[in-house]
Amino acid sequence: MLKIMRAKRLLPLTVALIASLAPLATQARRALTPEDWYRFLAVSDLQMSADGAAVAYLVTSYDKSTDESRAALWSADWAGGAGHQGVPLTQGESVSAPRFSPDGRSISFLSAQPSGSDTQLWLIDRHGGEPRQLTHLNGEVSGYEWSPDGAHIVLVMHGVKDSQVEGKPGKVGKASKVRKAEAAAKPLVLDAYQFKEDEEGYLTVASRPHLYLLDVRSGAVEPLTADPERADSHPQFSPDGRQVAYVSHKPGGGAEDAGIDEIWLVAPAAGAKPRRLLKTWTPNHQHLAWSPDGKSIAFLIGDEPKFNAYILDDLAVAEVATGHVRDLTGKLDRAVVSPAFTSDGRAIEFAIEDDGFQYPAQVVLATGAITHLGDSMVVSELATAAGHTAVLATSDASAIEVNALEAGKLRPLSAHNRALLDEIDLATVENFVFTSRDGTEIHGQIVKPPDFVQGHRYPTILWIPGGPNGQDQHELVLEGYGPPLERQLFATHGYVVLAVNYRGSSGRGATFARTIFADWGHKEVEDLLAGVDYAIMRGIADPGRLAIGGWSYGGILTDYAIASDTRFRAAISGAGSGNQLTTYGTDEYIVEYNAELGPPWRNPSLWTQVSYPFFHADRIRTPTLFLGGDKDFNVPIAGGEQMYQALRTLGIPTQLIVYPGEYHVLTRPSFLIDRFRRYLAWMEQYLGRSP
């Protein structure tokens, strides 16, 4: 399973690459290769200066020599364009969380420099220069927010072991290494209901973040929140600087507290008493935004906790004085992301996830009227200031880039991947609609090889998106589990790829998503197989050369499908599981399991039912490649290990690939490329190539 994840990772663009942005007008285009991953650059964390004159963002890439990823800070002028490429402001150690200072002259960011030290806060001139370290603290800074006057910064910190928060310049790296070594040598004491999280590991009391107030001029730091039972994050200053709103929850509480977020307010002063504003429920990352007049706060709100795994976040506003909440987008029946107030405070802009797209929209507070700000696009992040709106946008043929959104149209402000994409003959992507076995209308996309010939039947791969609360979109996403890149890789090597948004997916409303509640592996499989039948009926797919695969819930559904149908000649199950009993208490979804399936000792037959790929492994005939990271707490690799062992025992061709030190999303460059190579080799071994 996989929570919606929209933030992307990838390293600095060099001067040589900037110089190579001219289109390759005469050079023949070629197929995408696994090695191209080293040249892709991912753009993320978009920020806009208060005057709307500039944007800041991260550009992440992979370094072949060190086998690591690094994110660099970039800045671009609003008045520029793709022909006026932005400029890199940092190099060397990776950075995160860029933010403009209130006066717009500087950009702050987080970084662990030197490597291995605690993450601290840094500042650099907006136009470049040497960065300056703002904090030298005995703990990790994981987030922060400037006060409107620039005099203070609220820090989100964890791992603070003693009462003396402030450290000494030049000593942080050594102290950090000692503390980390000590932590690794001691037993971990756990008391949280959900006690583990992918990439974070085991959730101890020391890992719970709290808020601290930094005086920018003096460097003094004082605690704002300190309840050991709570975890505090996402601080946002009110426009007048008198209050800080933040998100808090109780990981040390019982089952009744699990998954509950609360929005609190506190004055930015040592000893101030926090006030709880409201409770909310959303399984995805919370996002707070103050109205310009400081009277209300926009945030994301879920529906019934019972449907935690299928929640489509609504946009809501809460009155600061009373806590009264108004849901602004409930009637849309679609998930929203990245809300931001317009400069005049009359409206909120956001992005809507809808049937293969994610487009920008606006809701007028006075009337509740919702209008589209653009169609047929995929927008992952949105920033607005001084009447300007910038977005991170992607399409089937374009990786995520920074764009100005003007009158419903995109104006490029970056083109980090243009040189590479100009070399590649990308596959075409077409929408298709078909009917599942019970008459339900299902939507998806067919990805055809660049040299596709109508009337020829092609080896066809059903590549399944993760989730289930997610969807295949018209995008070229460059992330560790990104189906859009994988389907391009397969298609440019001669395969037709089917992307089916099965029941359980988001993008078509709550009822469509909740159809599979407590009934995994049935309606989704019917939808997937019906998509294959449709492609065969259309004369596109070769019925004798079919394959299936996916990562996360895509891997789980692969296990379900090959245990239900023997037509597939090859399968790839990445970060999947065929025995859900194995995952109870070993992954991070205890809240979802108990809400949806109940504990196994209460509903053993239901748990056995949703684990049928393992208990009926003797039905499987498909050669299957299993893969996963050995540190994955999202879908632990035990799920793949058990299925591998079952097929190995049954004599079905199979292989297990374990990536050491990797979580649910692979990040080590050589491992990513290894995975892509294995994908292609497995398909070629059992399907062959184009017709």
Language model features with spans:
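Bacterial N-terminal signal peptides
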Residues: 12-22
